[in-house]
């Protein structure tokens, strides 16, 4: 038996009970979007996957796809797209966007900390005082010692041990 190409959506709120046809191209675009959503879900870590509202069969299909290679993975992505067609994908997409945005925010914060570290080493006490006014919980003596040692390492071209330690200290104190 042949499948119908277009899927009518009946809008019962209209007075004239008009049937709205969805084109085959639109159905294909929606399916392709859901497959891409499924592929993005597969790339998530298990911790991030738990933050997304998925039912058990969808979680199971995603976990299986994470262990597959190449062609089996492609088929599993198609299957996940099929499972997503029967569900409301808006909350899943919203949760995925939040998870991805959190990663971008963490990357931006790390970049900011690297800039602060470079300022501390290049400008010395002036930038240290400014940093301590913004973040009074930091240990002035420890930071000053790390900065002094990093400046010495830079002058004599030693490996940048304290340079990295400043960043680690800032990350441990400022990133919650």
Swiss-Prot record:
Regions crossing the membrane: none
Localization (cell): Cytoplasm
CC per GO annotation: cytosol
Alphabetical list of Pfam families matching this protein: DarP
GO molecular function: ribosome binding; rRNA binding
Keywords per UniProt: Cytoplasm, Ribosome biogenesis, RNA-binding, rRNA-binding
The keyword rRNA-binding belongs to this UniProt entry's keyword annotation: yes
An individual GO BP term: assembly of large subunit precursor of preribosome
Keyword hit for RNA-binding: yes
Chief location category: cytoplasm
InterPro entries the record matches: DarP, DarP_sf
Gene3D superfamilies given in the database record: PSPTO4464-like domains
Similarity section: Belongs to the DarP family.
Function summary: Member of a network of 50S ribosomal subunit biogenesis factors which assembles along the 30S-50S interface, preventing incorrect 23S rRNA structures from forming. Promotes peptidyl transferase center (PTC) maturation.
Alphabetical list of NCBIfam families matching this protein: PRK05255.1-1
Name this protein carries in UniProt: Dual-action ribosomal maturation protein DarP
Source species taxonomy: Bacteria, Pseudomonadati, Pseudomonadota, Gammaproteobacteria, Pasteurellales
